[in-house]
C-alpha cells in the first residue's frame, strides 16, 4: 500500500521511499523507513498529502506520495 491509498487519520510505518533526489529530501525532513506517520489529509485532484511525524506536519506531493510504501500500524 502507498501513502495515497492510506485513509486519513490512519497510522502507518514507512517501508520504502522513492529512489533518488526525492528520497534524499524526505530523509532530510526525517521521513525515513521504519518511522511511524499519521496521514492527516489528501487534497483532491492530485494535490499534496499531509502527514504528521513526531508532532510535525509535512506536505508531500501526490506524485511522490504514490511511491512511499507503507504498512498500516495495526498490521505490524
Question: Across the structure, where does each feature detected by a protein language model lie?
Answer:
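Compact, glycine-rich, soluble single-domain proteins
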Residues: 1-76
